[in-house]
Design a protein with these regions (language model features):
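Short amphipathic alpha-helical interaction/hinge segments
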Residues: 61, 65-69, 101, 117, ...
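Helix-turn-helix
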Residues: 10, 18-52, 56-60
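Helix-loop "lid/cap" segments that line or gate small-molecule binding pockets
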Residues: 91-98, 107-115, 194
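N-terminal intrinsically disordered/low-complexity leader segments
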Residues: 1-6, 201
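An amphipathic alpha-helix signature
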Residues: 12, 55, 83, 87, ...
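Amphipathic alpha-helical packing segments from all-alpha helical-bundle domains
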Residues: 66, 84, 99, 104, ...
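Hydrophobic/aromatic-rich alpha-helical bundle segments in the mid-to-C-terminal region
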Residues: 121, 125, 140-192
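Hydrophobic alpha-helical connector segments
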Residues: 70-103, 153-160, 187
Length: 201
């Protein structure tokens, strides 16, 4: 990575950290520059404003496809064993959410939902829509092949993913990751309960 690209990425990473702690309104360009280790004027060599930094962070997470990050050919091959598939997908999803930047972003997203700032990073509903779309397709596939009970895939999608997001919000919106085992236990318990309600007896 060229020096300029590395500095630009460092500005984004530092800004995400500061925004997630102080909010958009509580973070200044001066503070960002100080943490990056450059003059305040140096920020403007890469971004026109704090708002542009904020929007670029949001766009990065909007465009980061969770599905393409998590779903592999090996995982898709497990669809014929729905319980195993759901468990393994959940493990990969929690691991993805456990990265430092994912933790910071969900905290920032929650902080900015009801802020008085004119800049809105995105709504929780917008953030969850990609996961919903992916799960609609997965449950539609499982239903069509009679691997689970015949239930509206959109309903199944919401019923499956919403508790996982609640677990994420409760346990994974802090910087530390010391509760990962507890998070996984709760997630697996949800998968077991959910699968019991959709499996074909």
């Amino acid at each position: 990575m060229a020096k300029g690209e590395a500095t630009r990425q460092l500005i984004l990473d530092i800004s995400l950290d500061l925004f997630s702690k102080n909010g958009f309104a509580g973070t200044s360009v001066r503070h960002i520059a100080r943490e990056v280790g450059i003059r305040e004027s140096g920020i403007y060599n890469y971004f026109t404003s704090k708002t542009e930094i904020f929007k670029e962070i949001a766009n990065k997470f909007k465009s980061t496809a969770v599905g393409s990050t998590i779903i592999s050919d090996d995982l898709v091959e497990q669809l014929e064993e729905p319980h195993q598939f759901l468990n393994n997908f959940t493990n990969k999803l929690i691991s993805h959410w456990n990265s430092q930047n994912e933790r910071r972003f969900i905290r920032l997203l929650l902080m900015e939902q009801y802020s008085q700032s004119s800049e809105k990073i995105m709504t929780l509903n917008e953030y969850m829509n990609e996961a919903r779309s992916m799960w609609w397709m997965i449950f539609d596939e499982l239903t069509r092949h009679k691997l689970i009970k015949e239930v509206d895939p959109k309903l199944l999608s919401d019923e499956f993913i919403a508790p996982l997001y609640m677990i994420r919000i409760e346990y994974m919106a802090a910087d530390e990751d010391g509760k990962l085992d507890e998070v996984l236990d709760k997630a697996y318990n949800h998968v077991d309960f959910f699968y019991d309600s959709i499996k074909i007896d």
